[in-house]
Regions:
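Active-site loop signature of alpha/beta-hydrolase-fold enzymes
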Residues: 43-44, 70, 146, 221
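Conserved alpha/beta-hydrolase
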Residues: 55-76
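Primarily recognizes the serine-hydrolase "nucleophile elbow" in alpha/beta-hydrolase
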Residues: 97-158
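N-terminal cap/lid segment of alpha/beta-hydrolase-fold proteins
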Residues: 1-30
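Short, surface-exposed "cap/lid" segments of acyl-processing enzymes
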Residues: 20-58, 62
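The feature captures the conserved acid-bearing segment of alpha/beta-hydrolase catalytic domains
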Residues: 148-206
């Protein structure tokens, strides 16, 4: 069901999970929708197999990417909190080449695709969504779309914030279904910053009911940021239901 490959001319390590993978050939037997997913800082693409398994059982493939400096392209310096926006910038710039390889594979031909991520990975997803794209929906977890809320953190780089902050580029955002899951007591990524962004999306949307934010807490997760603790199963179910609705049902 899964295999590890290199995409984007070999620069981006990816874990591909496909519900119809032929074990003998290593190829998919029929195309299905796909979620392009990016993890958070200091972890790897293999972190959350439960997510990929649930989606595969629902008929959705996953393409999980290692962020720059992480996993198979480990670089301790790039995991420094002060370089978070550099990592986000590089990852957002690599997504198109990843998509080109996914398209060339034929494993998702004629199917919808989604993008999402956790924390820094979610930030990269939102940056990419402020440029022309063909994603049908997006989902992020413990991430932030209004970066002014991180001004006192080491990651805050005024030049990169001006260039990439999704809240400052709402005019370039295409109106698609969007789900944000968050921990209300998140110590690293304030829920208020994501709520401000989601509220702005809803205010601009012709279909505001398709844009939702759900907060948990207290969860017991480390720093109320690394996952959803006692609510992990509920978060997985919400995410899966959202993707099934917009990738498979297409409502």
């Amino acid at each position: 069901m899964s295999r590890t490959v290199r995409l984007a001319d070999g620069h981006v390590p990816a874990l591909l999970v496909h519900p119809h993978l032929d074990a003998a050939t290593g190829r998919a037997t029929r195309p299905v929708p796909v979620l392009v997913w990016m993890h958070g800082r200091t972890v790897t693409k293999e972190l959350d197999p439960g997510r990929y398994l649930r989606l595969a059982r629902a008929g959705i493939a996953s393409c999980a990417l290692d962020l720059p400096g992480h996993g198979e392209r480990f670089d301790a310096a790039l995991q420094d909190p002060a370089r978070t926006l550099e990592v986000v910038e590089r990852m957002a710039g690599e997504i198109d080449a990843v998509l080109a390889d996914l398209d060339a594979s034929g494993e998702h031909a004629g199917c919808r695709r989604a993008i999402g991520g956790m924390s820094a990975g979610g930030m990269a997803a939102m940056v990419r969504l402020c440029r022309p794209h063909a994603f049908g929906c997006a989902m992020v977890e413990c991430s932030i779309g209004s970066w002014r809320w991180q001004e006192r953190r080491a990651m805050f780089d005024p030049a990169r914030v001006a260039a990439m902050d999704p809240f400052r580029h709402l005019g370039e955002w295409r109106d698609i279904p969007f789900l944000a899951l968050h921990n209300e007591l998140d110590e690293w990524v304030p829920a208020e910053g994501q709520r401000e962004f989601v509220d702005a999306l809803r205010a601009r949307s012709a279909h505001s009911e398709r844009i939702t934010m759900h907060c948990y807490g207290p969860t017991g997760a480390p720093n109320e940021h690394a996952g959803f603790g006692r609510f992990a199963s509920d978060a997985k179910e919400r995410g899966t239901a959202f993707l099934v609705q917009w990738l498979l049902d297409g409502r």
